Amino acid sequence: MKLFLLLSAFGFCWAQYAPQTQSGRTSIVHLFEWRWVDIALECERYLGPKGFGGVQVSPPNENIVVTNPSRPWWERYQPVSYKLCTRSGNENEFRDMVTRCNNVGVRIYVDAVINHMCGSGAAAGTGTTCGSYCNPGNREFPAVPYSAWDFNDGKCKTASGGIESYNDPYQVRDCQLVGLLDLALEKDYVRSMIADYLNKLIDIGVAGFRIDASKHMWPGDIKAVLDKLHNLNTNWFPAGSRPFIFQEVIDLGGEAIQSSEYFGNGRVTEFKYGAKLGTVVRKWSGEKMSYLKNWGEGWGFMPSDRALVFVDNHDNQRGHGAGGASILTFWDARLYKVAVGFMLAHPYGFTRVMSSYRWARNFVNGQDVNDWIGPPNNNGVIKEVTINADTTCGNDWVCEHRWRQIRNMVWFRNVVDGQPFANWWANGSNQVAFGRGNRGFIVFNNDDWQLSSTLQTGLPGGTYCDVISGDKVGNSCTGIKVYVSSDGTAQFSISNSAEDPFIAIHAESKL
């Protein structure tokens, strides 16, 4: 009995690190600013069949309507209530999406904005996405309800009331982040309001949460909220399942607050990952892909089982957040596919793929002055995600997750799940290769000259279809064929001018 109690306690403590994806599904995709009706369709027609594990959705709760500038993406990070009512859709549409996605094995992860409410400068009676009244100047949010008692104004010690130094952890947690009204999460009432919101989402069927701005909350306050959360809905999850938690903590080193302070609550976003990988793939600062042999903890990252990793996210793809100019995005499509391919092949961390929309960038003194622009819309109404005949998306939705190279690497990761990093090869420069046990092998040529080498793949002999240049269709291949000898070796040739300078084969791409 003692052993059983120990094990059940252990299971409970560690459950928040488990992504709660359906068995065999290993990645999630952030469908940034998509409507719930479009996400439901995408789960059924694409994400389910293509092996995606889940979707990170934009904040589903009511936010302030920002008109200057006109309907920026960041208005959704300015809550006014916990009603499920935004530009992405209403509560019924949200419920329908969660049900339909779960029914095809695709989980929903909610971006939970719980550190703050909207900015203090908004006028009383200002527009909101569901019509709820608020008076931010007086700290009145009757739709929750919150009042002046529920904010940290008295706790913050800076003259401005805002964060003035990131070297002071008290300021970072107790003062206002860019003027956003900072909730007093040490109050049980505030914790209960937030937990009620998250529990409603859990009961609807979501699988977990991205905790926005976690760095700006005390880890113990987050834990107190998480301790109030229900188990996941048994319609789709085993009894006793706990929500997957990943906390947004930007920690590139050199600040008072470290990611490790948050490990007790769940996983943490590893922002060093995309920043460093971008530097390597761009060949900046003398970096080379040959240096990636000990990628992961060997590069000073957090432990793999605590990390949520990504090449770019909605913030840093537009110069916000962390990582700076090295971050690769869909605007740098060729190198971006290399970086995402590397991420999805490598065992480190739990992987998230980005799915973006295009906007009219306008750089002034190196800064995109249009970084605020919201999703494709007609007079503020988010446009439908249309699907073109070639399976790409229309209406300025980028849909990186539908790019063959990325979609097929999501499947590759599923196939090699649990297999060790193996058969590393490097030319000392930017040609590298590695395998995952006997289930998969990938080769990159990021040099300015041809790659031509015979490499040990670790795979059984036979003919394989490269899933980067094409697809296995029936028993034929629309891309490059790779011939693996009985000893596991294969000859690879990759031109430095290839559209995609990498090749990937796996157990399920064998012809």
Swiss-Prot record:
Q: Which cofactor does it need?
A: Ca(2+); chloride
What domain of life? Eukaryota
E.C. numbers = 3.2.1.1
For the ligand (Ca(2+)), the binding residues are N115, R173, D182, H216
| Glycosylated position list | N427
Alphabetical UniProt keywords: Calcium, Carbohydrate metabolism, Chloride, Disulfide bond, Glycoprotein, Glycosidase, Hydrolase, Metal-binding, Pyrrolidone carboxylic acid, Secreted, Signal
Which Gene Ontology biological process is one annotated for this entry? carbohydrate catabolic process
Name the predominant localization.
secreted
**One Pfam family hit:** Alpha-amylase_C
User: Which CDD domains does this one have?
Assistant: AmyAc_bac_euk_AmyA
Question: Which residues are catalytic?
Answer: D212, E248
Give the reactions, separated by semicolons, that this protein catalyses: Endohydrolysis of (1->4)-alpha-D-glucosidic linkages in polysaccharides containing three or more (1->4)-alpha-linked D-glucose units
Q: What are the recorded GO MF terms, alphabetically?
A: alpha-amylase activity; calcium ion binding; chloride ion binding
Details of cofactor binding:
Binds 1 Ca(2+) ion per subunit. Binds 1 Cl(-) ion per subunit.
- What PANTHER family is this protein classified in? ALPHA-AMYLASE
Please give the family membership noted in the entry.
Belongs to the glycosyl hydrolase 13 family.
Subunit-level organization: Binds to the sea anemone inhibitor helianthamide and magnificamide.
What else is on record for this protein?
A: The two forms of this enzyme, I and II, show very similar activities, molecular masses, and compositions and differ only in their isoelectric points. As no evidence for two variants were in the cDNA library of PubMed:10082956, it is most likely that isoform I (PPAI) and isoform II (PPAII) are two forms of the same protein.
The protein's name is Pancreatic alpha-amylase
* Species the sequence originates in: Sus scrofa
Upper lineage ranks?
Answer: Eukaryota, Metazoa, Chordata, Craniata, Vertebrata
